């Protein structure tokens, strides 16, 4: 019998997120100088920081490459930022091998075809509400939120609540 997503959430030690369509809504604002700007959700950032402070691994694997994104993620305390990844499966395997993380301990949130193969390797493949149909079909949990609109916060909060760690933030013990 297959485990429920909440049973799987109890095993999660590591969160891996794509950027475009997950941490952002997938839009790119092009400035007159050609610079591409993305908008990220503050609540998603709070949740990633809370996860790190609670001992979870947080990793970013993205095909995109934007220095502003890297700076934002570094400022949140994320050290494992893999932008311009030509093959997300290879990056995932290198990351999990380096830190000796079992794939079943990983929650991966992706939104589109480039995430498909890596999502098939993890314990808990998840996606935003507005992910592509192919990604929704393989996800064990589909957020009620769209990409860039709190989907990351939702899955982190869900895992931390299942593992009885979210209350530390809710009660102000991590100010």
Residue ranges of model-derived segments:
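Substrate-recognition element of Asp-dependent hydrolases with the DxDx(T/V) motif
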Residues: 48-72, 83
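Asp-based phosphoryl-transfer active-site loop
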Residues: 11-28, 119, 152
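A positional/architectural concept
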Residues: 23-54, 63
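Non-catalytic pre-domain segments flanking phosphatase-related domains
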Residues: 1-17, 165-175
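Short secondary-structure boundary segments
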Residues: 19, 63-64, 85, 129-131
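Mg2+-dependent phosphoryl-transfer enzymes with acidic/Ser/Thr/Gly-rich catalytic loops
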Residues: 34-38, 75-76, 80-82, 89-175
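Short coil/turn segments at beta-strand junctions that form active-site/ligand-binding loops
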Residues: 11-13, 56, 104-105
């Amino acid at each position: 019998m297959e485990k429920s997503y909440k049973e799987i959430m109890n095993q999660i030690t590591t969160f891996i997120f794509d950027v475009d369509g997950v941490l952002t809504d997938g839009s790119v604002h092009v400035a007159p100088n050609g610079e591409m700007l993305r908008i990220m959700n503050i609540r998603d950032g709070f949740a990633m920081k809370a996860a790190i402070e609670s001992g979870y691994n947080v990793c970013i694997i993205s095909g995109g490459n934007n220095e502003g994104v890297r700076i934002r993620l570094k400022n949140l305390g994320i050290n494992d930022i893999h932008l311009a990844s030509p093959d997300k499966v290879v990056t995932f395997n290198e990351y999990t091998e380096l830190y000796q993380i079992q794939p079943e301990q990983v929650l991966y949130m992706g939104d589109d075809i480039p995430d498909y193969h890596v999502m098939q390797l993890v314990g808990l493949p998840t996606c935003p509400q507005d992910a592509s149909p192919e990604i929704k079909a393989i996800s064990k949990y589909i957020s009620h939120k769209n990409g860039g609109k709190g989907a990351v916060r939702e899955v982190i909060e869900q895992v931390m609540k299942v593992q009885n760690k979210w209350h530390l933030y809710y009660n102000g013990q991590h100010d």
